[in-house]
Regions:
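Short N-terminal binding/cap micro-motifs at the start of the first secondary-structure element
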Residues: 1-3
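Conserved N-terminal catalytic core of the sugar/cofactor nucleotidyltransferase
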Residues: 6, 13-14, 18-91, 100
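A structural signal for short hydrophobic beta-strand segments in well-ordered beta-sheet cores
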Residues: 12, 125-127, 196
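Structural beta-sheet core signal
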Residues: 38, 89, 111-112, 196
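A secondary-structure boundary/capping signal
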Residues: 91-92, 199
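Left-handed beta-helix
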Residues: 158-159, 165-239
Length: 239
């Protein structure tokens, strides 16, 4: 995302007049989430300051990922703030439209998905008779068009941490990183049930050109703002 992120961390880049992270945080608040742990890296202090200022009523914890070695590794950093209750993982630059409150009380692990034209850019879900049977990170050959959008629900935070910890201890990397998709695949093989929540409202912010398109879509969706009324205005014609 250079040069946009030279001076601003990606989650704070503006989309439709607000930082990406604001859209994400609002969705979590609407779903009843009251405790958020943020994993930061580049320019992380700016994210910490912004969250504390904008969301003072939410319990927030922060951890720093010094080395960018994958999402599963980042999730492990939140382990000390996570109990055995339901836990969500949401990427800070993932914009989506979904009612996450439907996940309350869900006993399965749930993956939010959306159909895409180019699944090679994403982790994907393979279904058989409506059941999740395999999770594949950025497949080289098309096996499914159901992309993992970066929103996950886990019925047990403790079992999530166990899956990520096992992956890291085994040294199992994909494209040089510890992928959360691979950790979930290990959980699936160990009998953990997974379901999907399929949505259409997913907005890609991975590249500058898609960020511009997402900005346009969200502005169109929200409709035009009110036009201010000018009191006692005068128009001065050019000479």
């Amino acid at each position: 995302m250079r040069p946009l992120t030279w001076s601003t961390p990606k989650p704070l880049l503006p989309v439709a007049g607000r930082p990406m992270l604001a859209h994400v945080m609002d969705t979590l608040v609407d779903a009843g989430v009251d405790h958020v742990t943020l994993i930061t890296g580049y320019l992380g202090d700016e994210i910490v300051s912004w969250v504390r200022k904008e969301y003072p009523g939410i319990r927030t914890d922060f951890a720093v990922q010094e080395k960018t070695d994958g999402l599963a590794s980042a999730v492990l950093l939140a382990g000390e703030y996570t109990d055995d209750g339901p836990t969500m993982v949401v990427l800070g630059d993932t914009l989506f439209s979904a009612d996450l409150s439907v996940l309350r009380g869900e006993t399965r692990n749930m993956i939010v998905t959306s159909p895409v034209e180019d699944p090679s850019r994403f982790g994907v879900v393979l279904l058989e008779e409506g059941r999740v049977v395999r999770l594949i990170e950025k497949p080289s050959e098309p096996v499914s068009n159901l992309a993992i959008v970066g929103v996950y629900y886990f019925a047990s935070g403790e079992r999530l941490m166990e899956g990520c910890r096992t992956l890291v201890e085994k040294g199992q990397r994909t494209r040089g990183e510890f992928q959360l998709t691979d950790a979930m695949e290990l959980m699936l093989r160990n009998g953990e049930p997974f379901g999907i929540l399929d949505i259409d409202g997913w907005y890609d912010c991975g590249k500058p050109e898609t960020l511009l398109e997402t900005n346009r879509v969200l502005l169109d969706r929200n409709g035009p703002g009110e036009t201010p009324e000018l009191i006692r205005s005068r128009v001065i014609q050019p000479c």
